[in-house]
Amino acid sequence: MSQLREIQEEITRHEQQLVIARQKLKEAERTVEVDPDDVNKSTLQSRRSAVSTLEDKLAEFKRQLADVISRQKMDEKPVDPTGIELDDHLKERSSLQYGNVLDVNSIDIEEPSGQTADWLKIGSYIIEFALPIILKALHMLSTRGRQTVKENKGTRIRFKDDSSYEDVNGIRRPKHLYVSMPTAQSTMKAEELTPGRFRTIVCGLFPAQIMARNIISPVMGVIGFAFFVKDWADKVKAFLDQKCPFLKAEPRPGQPAGEAEFLSSIRAYLMNRQAVLDETHLPDIDALVELAASGDPTLPDSLENPHAAWVFACAPDRCPPTCIYIAGMAELGAFFAILQDMRNTIMASKTVGTAEEKLKKKSAFYQSYLRRTQSMGIQLDQRIILMYMIEWGNEVVNHFHLGDDMDPELRQLAQALIDQKVKEISNQEPLKI
C-alpha cells in the first residue's frame, strides 16, 4: 500500500512541475517571437526538453501505478486450485512454474535492435567536431573501452573537451560529443552513436591521425598489430606482386614480357575484385566518402596506402563504410577478426577446466564481423582472406601476446625457491607461480 501512495505522490509532484514547465515554455515561445536571437532559441529548446522529460517521467509513473493496481487485483483474486493462471490458455497445468512478467512497453518495434546504421548522418555528425575531442573519445572507447562501457552502461554519455565549443553571441559554449551506451535490451536509432559505431566511423575517417598517435585497442595489441603494420606499404607491395593461386594466365605468342606474370599475380586478382565492388556502391556511402574527401579526414584510397591497415587499429566491429569499396580492405578486417578468435582459442586451450568451460572462453569475432559487414551490402571474398592467412598467418601467430612469456627454466627455478621458502615457514602446500 505504501508503494501505491509513493507513486501517487510522485505523479502529483510531477504534474505540478509539468504545469510550471509548460508556463515557462509559453513564455519562451513568446520571447522568441519578439526577439529570435540564439540565446532565446537555446532557452526555448531547453524548455521544450524539460517539458518532454517531465511528460516521459509522468507517463512512466502512471504505467507503474497501473501495474501496481493490476498486481493488487491479481493478488486479491481467488487462487485456482489447479494452479493455472486465469488467462493461461492451457487446459492442464504445465510442468513449468510461472516466472517473471516481462514488460515490453518500452520496446519500439518500428526501430528494431540491430538495424543498419545511417552512416551518412553519423559521419556528418562526427566531422563537425574538432579532431582532439574525437581522438580522446576514441582513446576512452578503445584503449579504456571496457572500463568506460562498464561504468556508463545504459546511459547516454557526453564527451567534453576545450577544443570543442561553439560561439553563441560571443559566448563560448561547450559542444558535447554524445555516445549511447546500450544494454542488451536497448533499441538504437539509425543515426545514434554507440561505442561500436563510433570506433567504426572514426577509424574509417582518421586512420592517419590514429597511426600518428599510435592508438591501438587492447584486443588488437595482443595479436601483435603494432608489429604487423610496421613497414606496411613494403609488406603489401611484396604480397601483391606474388603469384595468385587462383589465377592462371597462359603466355600468348607476341605477348609483352612480364604481362603473363602480372595477369597471374595477386594484384591482378584484386583489380578484378575492385571491378566487382565498383558495381555494388550505395548512394549514402558514396555521399559520405565525398563529404569526408572535402574535409580533414584521411581516407585510404588503396590497400597499399601507408595507413590503410590502421583503419582496424581500434578493432571496429565491421569494415568502416569509408573503405568498404576498396578491394581487400573488408577482407583485411576479417583476417584480423580471425586472428583474435585464434588467440582466444589458444588461451582457452591452455587453461585448466572442463571442455565446456574452455568453450565459453572462445570468441566469435569473425562471425560477428562477417555478419555486420555483409549487412552493409557487400559479400566478402573468402579467397582474399585465405591468401592473407597463407602469407602472414604464421608470422602474426608467432607474435601473439599469450600472457605467459616466462622462460620454462626460469619458472622452474622460481617455483623451487617458492616451495623451499613455504616449507620453511609453514606446513601448507605451496601455490604454483
Swiss-Prot record:
Residues 1-175 are annotated as: Viral panhandle binding. Residues 377-433 are annotated as: Interaction with host DAXX. Residues 1-50 are annotated as: RdRP binding. A motif (YxxL) lies at residues 178-181. It is found in: Virion; Host cytoplasm, Host perinuclear region; Host Golgi apparatus, Host cis-Golgi network. Keywords: Capsid protein, Chaperone, Coiled coil, Endonuclease, Helical capsid protein, Host cytoplasm, Host Golgi apparatus, Hydrolase, Nuclease, Ribonucleoprotein, RNA-binding, Viral nucleoprotein, Virion. Residues 150-175 are annotated as: Interaction with host RPS19. This is Nucleoprotein. The lineage of its organism: Viruses, Riboviria, Orthornavirae, Negarnaviricota, Polyploviricotina. The gene is N.
